[in-house]
Amino acid sequence: MARTVPAPRTRRVDRGGDGARASGPAPTLRIVETRVLRGPNYWAREPVVRMLVDLGVLEEYPSDKIPGFNDALIALLPTLEDHACSLGRRGGFITRLRDGTWAGHVAEHIALEFQILAGTDVRHGKTRGAGPVGQYNCIYEYREEQVGLEAGRMAVRLVNYLVAPDDPEFFFDFAPELERLIRIAERQAFGPSTQALIDEAVSRDIPFIRLDRHSLVQFGHGLYQKRIRATMTSLTSAIGVDIASDKSLTNQLLDSAGLPVPRAEVVDTEDAAIAAARRLGFPCVVKPLDGNHGRGVHLDLQSEDAVRAAFSGAVRESRSGDVIVETYVAGNDYRCLVIGGKVAAIAERVPASVTGDAEHTVRQLVEIANSDPRRGIGHEKVLTRIKLDDAAEALVRDQGYGIDDVVPDGTRVKLALTGNMSTGGTSIDRTIEAHPDNVEIAETAAQIVGLDVAGIDFICPDIATPVRETGGAIVEVNAAPGFRMHTHPTEGEPQYVARPVIDLLFPSGSGARIPIIAVTGTNGKTTTVRMVAHILKLMGRRVGMTSTDGIVVDGRLIRKGDMSGPRSAQMVLQNPKVDTAVFEVARGGILREGLGYDRNDVAVVTNVTGDHLGLGGITTIGQLANVKGVVVEAVPRSGTAVLNADDHYVYRMGRHCAGRVVLFSMSTIKGEDGFDRVDGHTSRGGAAFCLETSTEGELIVLRLGSRTMPVLYTHLIPATFGGRARMNVANALAAAAAAWAAGAHLHDIRQGLRTFSTSFFQAPGRLNLLEVGGVRVVIDYCHNVDGMRQLADFVNRMMVEPQTKAGRIGPTKGGTRTGRAIGVLGIPGDRRDDDQREYGAIAAGAFDEIIVREDKNLRGRQPGETAGNVIDGVRTAKGEGAARVARFDKVLEEMSAVRTALRRAVPGDLVVCCVDDAIAVYREAMSAAGQSRGGTAFTDPGELQAPEG
């Protein structure tokens, strides 16, 4: 429905400059809806935010008509100069701004720039009209979801502020707001070690899934998956981690192996710590038994008083309450990173410090050091900001200075005792300088503790000389060591330490991706998905399947309900049993969130018709085809798109496929579009699955270039009811093509199709045929106009006495009907009025009696409104003489309608139930027949749930 735009309101706004006051519009930009599209989607291949905005009166005010707006925006965000926009050159957006562009477009660019300023590299965006006057879809790329969403909200607020900077209601404090966004980005971003591993995996085309808001990440899909948490991996030994977290045990094991370690004792009281220090001798070290990141570590303690003070700090950081007292080893601090038993990098860690200049205080020197753009909060950047906490202030006092004292020129003041990067330390790469003896000691230490990735901390005078000669020791072994000091050393060459970790997880020749077959279209998706999954399962594949009925993994239902969206796809890709994924991809999921993965190896599009028009901003079949076409655009060069040659919109999708195209077609007559398209495609060496007719029946064949290979007669496929269910003939063609593209041989396809039926337990709610006291009952989920057209054709064929020849049933449509066809019909309330009427009109030509019901979810309609539209269609068709229906009425409650139909039916009749709750109808039919419902692959049909439209 079009929105009525109010008359423009103006306000007096002080625009600065020469002091003049100018008339400007009201700040009426507002967000109507926001969607996060996490995979390939209708708007872009990359993850984007779709922000639907309403300009209000700003629709009449492009940027060049708002006094002072452009100059104020550029003054706040001069880096907008880098935006090329549609002009394709630097400064392009500024040109558009000065020429006049609309507020939605401006908000899009501001949202991108805010993210860039927060440290996120994003570039792509676009703004398009959304239909109603003044409403626009602002599409912009994001990396971190919360950052992208907040950037959009801030962009809208900033636009309104710049439109009316004197209005306190719209005040926008730029610097604090940007700082807040930066903090959000810091919290959401991966740490540098995790990000290094992700970057390396992505460079090898290994997909990743973030499993929590921290550092738990899955690399690979299905049975190939591996996990990391920071730098711990799926291969990391739990015992090894336990040993490394117990510093005393680590020390004992290394000492038993003859490796150099300091003498140490574990204590749990202050007095015990002092006694241990006396035995070990001064200077000594006090540290938590199970601490990390250097917290609570006190070095070079020279007296009992120092030990007493250090104990209280160490015990606070100890989870167990135990503390280690050990001999102090003098020297430099080195971290040896061991990956897969080999040293990958060595860094010298330099504790945080500042150097006096005879001008600034210690506090000011720290502020100067923290202004280095390489320093950030936590692991945000390559260096961490130095904190002036109590420990740092105490250390400064120990050196004879106060925190606000001016330090003599050239005097170095330590701010931390350890060289941990997390306390503001710096690093120097020493990888190529390390002596082979020291390298061997580090590798042995990692093997003894039992870690695939380990950080071995050496204290020694020089890593370039053997520690056994110079007097050094291993003071700690770390599980999950940080990579930042190696990938971004303050001095020296960076070491690409993520590479050997990924080599460890995915050795050369190992897989990371499982085949993904994605099926979309208006009708036939669910049955096609089931057919493909059935074929592949018979080949021995462990298939993970999603559909509108649920998620099935290796033949077992693990989640019931409508599971045709991206989150369900993610569930399958995270399942370690699955080696092949077959996904039903619904229109709604693509529009709401995009695909649940980055690409599919096989994309199948069954058809595109006018169902769901008017929903989600999609108003034409062309737009709907673009939505369905997302799966085709997600096909890589090595993949395949399986397209319906009989459908003009689907056939055209082949132009957007990076891989090969396999067609399927029901057309058998030269001159028909589908037949001619297949002819042209195969003449160019392409492949197609199509039909050929002969005296023996209707045959599915594979045409591959000039060759034609027989697959299977359609009447031998149980799901086609002897070839009379033409929709399932089309679905079988699509499934055969998809399975072939996924690596199935023709004999696999034959076996799969010959053993696939539409029984309730193999395909619930999809053309299930039951016998109830001589009455044939069909349960189906026919919910749109094209589906009714196909169902009507099926009913007409089923009501005619079949012709048989050579053991086959012919797909006969003409002839004399036997018995009556009674239909229980319903269409979702969110379909257009005209579609609901057409649905009824088509049904009127196939059924002798029609009972119209409604879904429980009326989708915004009044009770009886949808049924009334269907009845109007039936009545119109009957009035025009285009109907065979003799009786039609409304019974709105679904089960009451089904019971009414079953009561009216007599032996020989066909009752077709187009219902929302297929399980309840099945139970009712079985109850009427007095039959048992047990003895099937499912314990009870209640394990299933009828799909939602």
Locate the predicted segments by residue:
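ATP-dependent carboxylate activation and anion-phosphoryl transfer catalytic cores
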Residues: 2-203, 342-345, 350-364, 391, ...
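ATP-dependent carboxylate-amine ligase
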Residues: 25-27, 31, 37-69, 74, ...
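Conserved N-proximal alpha/beta basic substrate-recognition cap immediately N-terminal to
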Residues: 133, 139-279, 292
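Residue-level signal for inorganic ion chemistry
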Residues: 201, 457, 546, 584, ...
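Active-site nucleotide/adenylate-binding loops and adjacent lid/helix of ATP-dependent enzymes
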Residues: 225-387, 436
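Walker A (P-loop) phosphate-binding motif
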Residues: 231, 508-557
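Flexible active-site lid/hinge loop adjacent to a nucleotide/diphosphate
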Residues: 557-678, 716-721, 785-789
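Adenine nucleotide phosphate-binding catalytic loops in nucleotide-utilizing enzymes
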Residues: 617-625, 629, 639, 659-789, ...
